[in-house]
């Protein structure tokens, strides 16, 4: 029997179920992957509005990931919402040590409106965090913040 490959989803919690860890887990299951996760933030939001974002404490985030890494043979990492520079710096340390594929899906805004990342941290993400990805997959709204050029595919 083949064991499922394991991916680590590092993202936020969307209580409306439209994004974040919930959709990463669903997508992983669709592709017959086992998804383990670490929460970057919790949000209070609906499909129409982001009311509040509460970043995970860095110490807690680090402990969670350290235990996942020790107990799991990861095949890859998928990163979504990174709410601040502190979490980003911790993720950089982690992905630099693992040497596995990393997909970063930069998320700056909630679907219903509201920012996930402040302007100062956005510059850090663009200049120092995104270069650590194997693949960067911004949606069309996020492309301008990454300073990449969008290419249409038909």
Predicted features and spans:
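Glycine/small-residue-rich loop that forms an oxyanion/phosphate-binding "nest" at active or ligand-binding sites
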Residues: 76-95, 101-121
């Amino acid at each position: 029997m083949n064991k499922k490959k394991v991916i680590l989803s590092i993202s936020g919690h969307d209580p409306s179920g439209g994004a974040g860890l919930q959709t990463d887990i669903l997508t992983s299951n669709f592709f017959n992957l086992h998804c383990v996760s670490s929460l970057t933030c919790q949000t209070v939001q609906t499909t129409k509005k982001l009311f509040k974002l509460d970043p995970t404490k860095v110490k807690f985030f680090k402990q969670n990931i350290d235990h996942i890494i020790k107990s799991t043979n990861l095949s890859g990492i998928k990163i979504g919402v990174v709410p601040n520079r502190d979490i980003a710096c911790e993720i950089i340390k982690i992905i630099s040590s693992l040497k596995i594929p990393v997909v970063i899906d930069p998320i700056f805004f909630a679907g219903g409106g509201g920012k996930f990342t402040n302007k100062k941290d956005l510059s850090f993400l663009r200049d120092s965090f995104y270069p650590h990805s194997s693949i960067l997959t911004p949606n069309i709204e996020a492309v301008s913040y990454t300073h990449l050029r969008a290419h249409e595919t038909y």
